[in-house]
């Protein structure tokens, strides 16, 4: 019985260390600030942007914690389950660029992504397990799509 308790204790410590190691490698953890907003490439130019939402979000802090994202709704996430993935341009913003291409074959998702600052074939994306995925332009810049607007977040 004593051996089982010791084994369980050591396994728990090992699991805790593994979680800490994963969290230490997660460069997205920490404080971010919503620094700007632009009309999303998929937005209908005839529709006006929701400036009230932009005013409510721009300048606000978003804090990525180990198991939670603190910040204004809908960016907050009480039970975050992070998964880092590499998306292609056609996959970011819930596949909006691919949908644009399906309607117009001349649309190039890579060029649209580049217009928002994304470079290369693999776009680091953090899936949160909540409504919003965060797409990273670089280590200090992330973008999210929300209600036909692309919001930029800068690491603090």
Regions found by a protein language model. Name each.
Residues 38-41, 64-132:
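Contiguous, well-ordered beta-strand patches that form the walls/edges
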Residues 1-9:
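Bacterial N-terminal signal peptides that target proteins for export
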Residues 34-72:
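Short, solvent-exposed loop/hinge segments that bridge or flank secondary-structure elements
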Residues 61-68, 129, 133-142, 156:
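Short, solvent-exposed coil/turn segments at beta-strand boundaries
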Residues 76-91, 136-156:
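Edge beta-strand at a domain terminus
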Residues 21-31:
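N-terminal helix-cap/turn-to-beta initiation motif at the start of protein domains
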């Amino acid at each position: 019985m004593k051996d089982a308790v010791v084994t369980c204790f050591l396994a728990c410590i090992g699991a805790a260390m593994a979680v800490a190691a994963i969290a230490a490698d997660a460069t997205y953890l920490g404080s971010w600030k919503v620094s700007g907003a632009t009309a999303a490439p998929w937005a209908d130019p005839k529709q006006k942007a929701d400036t009230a939402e932009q005013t409510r979000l721009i300048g606000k802090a978003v804090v990525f914690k180990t198991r939670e994202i603190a910040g204004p709704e809908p960016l907050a996430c009480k039970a975050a389950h992070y998964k880092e993935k590499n998306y292609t341009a056609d996959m970011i913003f819930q596949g909006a660029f691919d949908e644009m291409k399906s309607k117009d074959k001349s649309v190039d998702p890579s060029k649209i992504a580049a217009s928002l600052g994304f470079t290369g074939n693999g776009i680091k994306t953090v899936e949160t397990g909540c409504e919003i995925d965060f797409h990273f332009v670089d280590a200090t810049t992330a973008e999210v799509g929300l209600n036909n607007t692309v919001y930029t977040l800068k690491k603090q």
